[in-house]
Each structure stands twice: as structure tokens, then as C-alpha cells.
Amino acid sequence: MGVSDYISRPFDTSVVRQRVYNTIKLYAKQRKLIDLVAGQMQEKEKNNQIMVNILSHIVECRNGESGQHVRNIGILTKILLKKLMQKTDRYQMTWGDLNRIALASALHDIGKIGIEEAILNKPEKLTQEEYEKMKKHTVIGWSMLQNLKQYQEEPLVRIAEQICRWHHERYDGKGYPDGLKGDEIPISAQVVSLADVYDALTNERVYKKAIPHEKAIEMIVTGECGQFNPLLIECLLEIKEDIPIQLMNAEHRNSWTPLGGDNTLVAGLKDRRIEDK
């Protein structure tokens, strides 16, 4: 506990009474200020979520998909991160980080807005030339966010930049666009990458049929979709029974909230604790 005042002996009752009154008054003002800031933060988080959802929905529509993919990525990202935080403190994440990564995950493919529609929605396998063009969506998305100069200090924007550019990197360095290896890849991009691959496997696309849940897990674990962080594979195996349930529940609600019901940033302030080829 902090000390806001002290009284020297001998005590004067009138002085004690006034000091107590001042302390109570100061505390009330502090609480009012905390509630005001918390309310502003909550409004900002809400506005961020609305804008992210709008932008990701635009990309999904152009990509010939519903918002289901974005929703699923957010849910999978959040439950993977929760499990990861329970297993290790290696990445020094807070609940605020978890919420921001889950929200930013909705922008992972925003760069596809710069890819030709004929390539995005081609029902056959892409040619090598088309595939090279498709791969550019990572850098396009990153560049779009980099151009938001006035928002570069925003944690949400920085995380979204990481995810956009590096969500197709692989743990063994065989991904793109930069061939990053291991934990050179930000954990935000690692988790979204795994969530993206799982959802791409288990859902129908214009060029492929959906793969059953168990088969998708097997393909990921055995490295058929590229190598992932062994810790994340452990997390995936530990939550694999919950994944279909979580996604089905979200589908019934027809919505998802990356911040969940527990806005940790605001709650913390109020408590003052404070390839898919």
C-alpha cells in the first residue's frame, strides 16, 4: 500500500479529521478519474473492434468467403494463446496482449485486397506465377499498415503488421516472405499461422473440399502443412477436443468478440492491478 499523508505527534483531533477528509476526497477523485479513463479505453477498444471487423469483412467478401474464416481465426488464436500462457512464460504475454493479438488476427489477409480477383477465386490449382503473385499479399498488407504513420505507436497496429507480413512463415525457415526461422517469427504471427492453416483445411474453398477435424490435426502435427513451433503443437493437441465445440458455439451466436466478456485492459485499470496454396 502507498502512503498519501502522515500526521506527527502529538495528534490534534481537528487536524486528524481534516486529513482523513482530504484523503477520502482525494480517493474519490482518483476513482472518478480511473472510471473515466476506463470508460474511454473501453470505447476505444470497441471502436477498434468495429473498424477491424469492417475491414476484414471487406476482404472476405472480395475473397468470395463469408466472415466465418475471420471469426474462426480469432477464436482459434485466443484459445491457443490461453493454453500457451498456461504452459509457459517464455513469451512474456499479458491478457492485454492476448486480446490484441486475437483482434488483430482478423486483419491477417487484408493484403489480399491488392491481389487480382481471378487469382483469389480461381477454382483450380494456381500456376507457379499466380502463386508468386498470391504470396505478395503478406507484404501488401504489411505495407498498407506501415503507411498509417500516425498510428505506428498503437500496439494493435504493430501486432497487425507482424501478423500480416509473417503469418505464412514456418518454424523451420521454409515459409515466406522473409524465410524467418524459429522465434524470429513473432509469436502473434506463429499462432495466427497455425489457426489459419487449421481453418483452411477444415473448411471448403473454391478449389478444395473440407477436411475432417481429426485429419486436419494429423496433417498439422505430422508437418504436411509446414513446421510449426513444437510448443504450439502441444497446445493444439491439448485443446483439439474443444476446438469444434468452440467454433460451433460461435456459429450459433453468429458473432464473436476477440475481447471476450472480460476486457482485461479496462478491468485491470479499474482494479488498479494495473498454405494453403
Regions found by a protein language model. Name each.
Residues M1, R9:
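A Lys-centered signature of the CheY-like receiver
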Residues I7-S8, V16:
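A structural signal for hydrophobic residues in beta-strands of small regulatory alpha/beta folds
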Residues V15-K29:
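Receiver (REC) domain switch/output surface
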Residues Y27, R31-I34, A38-V52, N99:
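Signal-transmission coiled-coil "S-helix" linker that connects upstream sensory/regulatory modules
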Residues N48-G64:
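Conserved HAMP-HisKA connector
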Residues E60-K277:
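Metal-dependent catalytic cores of enzymes that make or break cyclic nucleotides
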